[in-house]
Amino acid sequence: NNSRYKKSYPEVSGYYIPTLLRWGFRDMAVTYAGWLCSIQHEEGAWYDTDDKEPYVFDTAQILKGLVAIYPIKPEVKDSLIKGCEWLLGQITEEGRLVTPSKAAWGNDGVCSELIHLYCLSPLIDAAKLLDKPEYEKAARRVADYYISNYRDKILNIFTHMLWRLFAI
């Protein structure tokens, strides 16, 4: 969201965790992980800052944090699995990863669905960490879908802050 919000931002808290661990702020990372697990919705998703809508991207960024903290705080396992399973449930038969709401996205020039490529690494990492090969298989299917259908757009570095390049 942006600075006018005076609330904790779950998505950002999720991707802070690996950085906090890298810089030695273990206790803070553990606290963030505990908070994130406590606000996870029953279906496995995490919602926007206002807790109104579930988002694929936000959920995936939180999963990155839970993957990073898992060796230190194995109690996150259930939340990690629920989140991954929810993400898998957002994949269409052809391999497109769709979010239930695009309310915060604006038009395609502001936020492209291709940012979902950046959601695949936590599935791949969780697959290895939890011995769940179906997570990696699903992530590869999504990558194949976007590469097959959006190759030109993916290669256009001027769309949505280079997220896609980080994902590939």
Which functions belong to the PLM regions below?
Residues 1-168:
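Glycan-recognition and catalytic cores of secretory/periplasmic carbohydrate-active enzymes
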